[in-house]
């Protein structure tokens, strides 16, 4: 309840979604949380990410991992969540990672493309959405502006969890 009191401008639906994350898993109710982020296969490539552990190629593996480990939530790109959201509906709070990038270029000034939407997060029953910003990037102003626009669009439904990538 104390944590929820810090979000006085949010509506009951948004607070309910935040509560789902805070009360789930082994740390549920402690005010602490652990989220399984599975977007590295997109950003760093499947060879580096999944080849060392072949079962990880199956998106459902990550749902099971998060559940067996008693984690607070599972965050992933749209395709990963679509692959298992129906089978695991209500079992685990989901976080849709709205933006992603790949490693096919040697871009020293990274920027992520928006690959998910608020509508998709609602359709999948997500408890929150995630977004990555690279603070040192020359594109940081555009990333912050997109983050602000998505935050405004998401506010009636979700907390937007921002990740500052390095």
Label the model's feature ranges.
Residues 1-38:
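N-terminal basic, low-complexity leaders that serve as flexible interaction/assembly modules and, when applicable
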Residues 28, 33, 41-166:
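Alpha/beta enzyme core
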């Amino acid at each position: 309840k104390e944590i929820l009191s810090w979000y006085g401008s949010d509506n009951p639906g948004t607070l309910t979604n935040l509560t789902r994350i805070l009360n789930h898993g082994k740390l549920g109710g402690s005010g602490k949380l652990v989220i399984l982020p599975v977007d590295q296969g997109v950003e760093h490539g499947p060879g580096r990410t999944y080849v060392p552990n072949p079962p990880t190629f199956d998106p459902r593996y990550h749902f099971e991992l998060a559940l067996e480990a008693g984690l607070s939530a599972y965050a992933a790109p749209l395709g990963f969540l679509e692959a298992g959201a129906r089978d695991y509906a209500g079992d685990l709070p989901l976080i849709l990672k709205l933006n992603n990038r790949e490693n096919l270029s040697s871009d020293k000034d990274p920027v992520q493309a928006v690959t998910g939407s608020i509508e998709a997060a609602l359709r999948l029953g997500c408890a929150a959405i995630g977004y990555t910003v690279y603070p040192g990037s020359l594109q940081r102003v555009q990333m912050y502006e997109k983050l602000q626009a998505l935050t405004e669009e998401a506010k009636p439904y979700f907390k937007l969890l921002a990740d500052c990538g390095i």
